[in-house]
Amino acid sequence: MRKTLTSIRFLSDGIRVKDKWNSLISDLVVEPTNSTGPLSGTTYIVKDNIATSHGYTTAASKILSNYESPFNATIIDLLSSNGSKLIGKSNLDEFGMGSANYNSYFNKVTNPYDNTKVPGGSSGGSAASVAGKMCSFSIGTDTGGSVRLPASYCNVFGFKPTYGRISRWGVIPYAQTLDTVGIIGENVNIIKRVYDVLNKYDDKDPTCLPEEVRQKIPTTKKETLTIGVPHEFVLKELSADVRESWEYALSKICKLGHLVKPISIKTIKKALPSYYTLATAEAASNLSRYDSIRYGYNTNESVNSPIELIATNRSDGFGSEVQRRILLGNYTLSSDSGDHYLRATQIREELCAEFSSIFNNSHVLLQDEQSSDKVDLIMAPTSTSTAPTWDEFVSANEKNFLNSYVNDVLTVPASLAGIPAISVPVNGIGIQLMGQFGDDDLVLQLADQI
């Protein structure tokens, strides 16, 4: 167990009193460069794995606890030039690895609606800051559900756009083929306003969708939508209140004139193990850069060799969950286990193709297979239950760390497919809408009606 110093949080006295949930790592006041933009008058808090030239960028890790970025992430400059004021950096699971905001060097985040419950992760601080009304909106990152799950637990909206819609330049990577900048807000209106500002091509990010691809994506609105309900999401583990809210949301959209039909996406059943195989492999590669020699926390211990110093720095600088995922990822990439990685990539390709074939609109990057079950959007729960208490989460995690991984079972399919998804609060429970690759506006259109 690493020693955690709560005094390391970089907060002014006023914010420290206001932040009852430990949702912030640092508070800032960075005025916008343009005070008359479309986001004029708004304030936001950004997840602390996104680079800002003001203050620290820690990824909630000891190994980066004193790191100051010399540049802003692209999204920070976009928000500033469009009128929004940055007022803080939010707490998170270290390097985005976790589903409860438990794995932070700066201590756990609590849920504003019930401080005995987890806020979800890894963007728990971002969700808690919105639920606690500390800002107009917050920015998080979503790798396997890290915006949608905390939004569900904290009873706010959490939007993961299509992969490549928003620039990742300046985002500290966990798994770069999955990491997506997401937006958390109290309503769809503010999320749409922020999304319109950030939905721009950035030549500094090679995964950002180029203009010629964006122009091929349909932009027409449909009055009557067909909503698919995959039976693979009808899990026996769903709690009664989650089922009830899901049924309520489906009945509501029927009353609005939309159609609902059952569908099947068989590869969803293989999504969770595929996700953790790929994500940990990418994490092992991405986090190999942190040696604490050039920047970051250094133990400054007297050792016999540079390699020994790096090993000491990494052992002391990374938390237990990050170390676990690095080990899992290195094993996956080893010669003895390479077949698992290849199989996971195949499953991901199959899932992308199956999702693509189910939607009415075509996928701009894939050739769609034919399906008789065409729908416009998909609706499913965001999580299998409401937020667990801290005692329940810790007890389950101590019995088997894999229990916390299962929390992502309903969110990782959209992440693997790279499709847009939003968690909408329905009677205090998150209900998830998913759309075709690039159909972000259609997802937001229906989310605003629920």
UniProtKB/Swiss-Prot annotation:
PROSITE patterns assigned: AMIDASES
Record's GO cellular component terms: glutamyl-tRNA(Gln) amidotransferase complex; mitochondrion
Catalytic activity: L-glutamyl-tRNA(Gln) + L-glutamine + ATP + H2O = L-glutaminyl-tRNA(Gln) + L-glutamate + ADP + phosphate + H(+)
The keyword Nucleotidyltransferase appears for this protein: no
Active-site residues per Swiss-Prot or TrEMBL entry: K47 (charge relay system), S122 (charge relay system), S146 (acyl-ester intermediate)
The keyword Ligase belongs to this UniProt entry's keyword annotation: yes
GO molecular function: ATP binding; glutaminyl-tRNA synthase (glutamine-hydrolyzing) activity
Stored Gene3D superfamilies: Amidase signature (AS) domain
Catalytic activity, EC: 6.3.5.7
HAMAP family tied to this protein: GatA (MF_00120)
Protein name: Glutamyl-tRNA(Gln) amidotransferase subunit A, mitochondrial
Organism per entry: Candida albicans (strain WO-1)
